[in-house]
Structures are given as C-alpha cells and as structure tokens.
From Swiss-Prot:
Keyword rRNA-binding: no
A biological process term (GO) from this entry: lipid A biosynthetic process
GO CC, any one term: cytoplasm
Record lineage: Bacteria, Pseudomonadati, Pseudomonadota, Gammaproteobacteria, Chromatiales
Gene3D superfamilies hit by this protein: Hexapeptide repeat proteins, Udp N-acetylglucosamine O-acyltransferase, C-terminal domain
Protein name listed in UniProt: Acyl-[acyl-carrier-protein]--UDP-N-acetylglucosamine O-acyltransferase
Amino acid sequence: MRIHPTAIVEDGAQLHDSVTVGPYSIIESGAVIGEGCRIESNVRIFGVTRMGAHNRVCHGATLGSEPQDLSFTPEKARPLIIGDHNHFKECVNISGGIKSEGGTRIGSHNYWMAFSHAGHDCVVGDHNVFANTATLAGHVEIDDHCFLSGQVAVHQFCRIGSYVMIAGVTGVPQDVPPYMLADGHRARLIGLNVVGLRRNGFGQEQRTRIKQVYRLILRSGLRLDDALQRAEDEYPGPETKRIVAFIRASRRGIVSFG
C-alpha cells in the first residue's frame, strides 16, 4: 500500500494492500476500497463508500458525500456502493443514499468525466459514459451502455434505458426508452441510436426490428397498451422484450417523439 504522507486515512477505513492514495486526500473511517484502486490527489471518500476493485479516482473527486437533500440528517445516511473498473475524472461528485435501503449504487466499467454528478439513491448500471457536467438528480436509474453528453440534466426519478444516447445540454424530464437518441431543451426522441448500436455489436436485423417496434409504438395511433401487446406479438425477440418492459414500468411517462 502506498499512501502519500500528506493524505489522511482515518482509523476504521479498510484499504486493500494494493491501493495507492495521493497527496492531500482524505479517506474516512468506514470506507472500504478494493484491490488495485488508485486514489489521486485531493480526493475525499466518505465513510459510507464501499468500492470494488481497480477503480481510478482523479483529483478533487468526492465519493459518498452527504445527499443534497434538506431532509438529510446523519442517522439517515445510506451507503454508496461502487463496482469495479470505474473511472472518476476530476471533481466528480457522487452522493451517498438517504431514502432507499440500498443507497446509491454504481455498477462497473463506467466513465465519469470532469464535474459530472450523481445524486442520492441513483442506480447506475455498467459501461456508461457521463460527459463533462452531466448531472443525475436523486433516484435516477441508468441501465447499461448509455452515453450522456455534456451538461445533460436528468430530472429526479427518471429512468434511462440501455444503449441510449442523449445530446448535449438536454434536460430530461421523463423516461428515455432503450436504444434511442434524445435531444432538445426538453428531451425529445429523435431516432434510433444507430452508431451506439453498431459499436455494441447490434446487426442490421436487430436494428431493423428495434426500428419497427418503435414505429408501431410511437406512430401507429393505437392505445399504448394495445401497441405494446402488438409489438410483442409481431416482433418477438430480446430487444422487443426490453423495450416493452421498460415502457410498462415507467412511472413518469416517456419523453415525446419528434
């Protein structure tokens, strides 16, 4: 273990022997940091944080900080659970939980660019990219393989489905279903995330099926329940199943199309 002499590692913090801690960083009692993690300079890791292996935390980042919620009191604190192989760039802030027993949960292989933020009780999957200053309000859920561009702001309790791309400076007030592109001052669906799907190995047949499913759901004029059922019947497959399940589970509704 390599700990810079100016760093503060409180008694009760649990660090794997292979962890490195840079100058002026603070790791509070109760924090758990797994194998191969690299903590750079001026980082603060709060005691509610539980971190897996091979994460990199860059200058000025804060992980597990107090939720930005006026109702917060220390006895309400819930954990921040982080998986493996995440990269937190400069001044990233991830809050601990407050209102859900599981707390704030970050999966694995996520890339958080400078000044990006996840609020309390967010649940983030794997292989996502959050560009500079992308912001998730409390209780937001992000699935897998999403790309949120710079200055995207997601309203609390919204859900973002897998393989979604959201354009820069977009405000997201409702759920964004899987495989889609969203853009606008208030997000609107503008088409399929074709580039993202190609990069993740989706073939032409899969992309065509996804497009057919969304054309049916968004443009057929059918009642939503009827359109979802018809999509399942006419275009069976894992992509259809993911889309239909996501929309049926929506509490805030889906962002508009076009």
